[in-house]
């Protein structure tokens, strides 16, 4: 049994029913859904309408084939995590499901680690700025400026990592 997909039973009761995910956890939801339909245009339109209603967007698109031999499309769709389950249901109603695989990734520890590092670096930057204001000579000032530059680089790097995690958590794929 799985909780929102994947290979885990986390989030399941003894009876096998889903529990609401812990809002404090930072979970990335991913699904790979294959659909088929003899009505390509209407199924595609229905799926894109469900995506718009869920507040999602097309991240990438690839299509091919012909009306004579069959057309296909492969989309990478981003859906707000709180709309993930209802969007999958709507998507499955737009055509016949041929396969579905789902996975989850709990990135709570990574997220907490990035936040802790950012807090530590912000405190370090503040202390270095205080020291810079008290620098007695040019040599000390240059050394402090060098350290500030390194700390700022690390802050920007961790801020970028946090933004990526936030995006992956907020929008399921």
Task: For the regions a language model picked out, list residue spans one by one.
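Soluble oligomerization/assembly scaffold segments of membrane-associated complexes
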Residues: 2-172
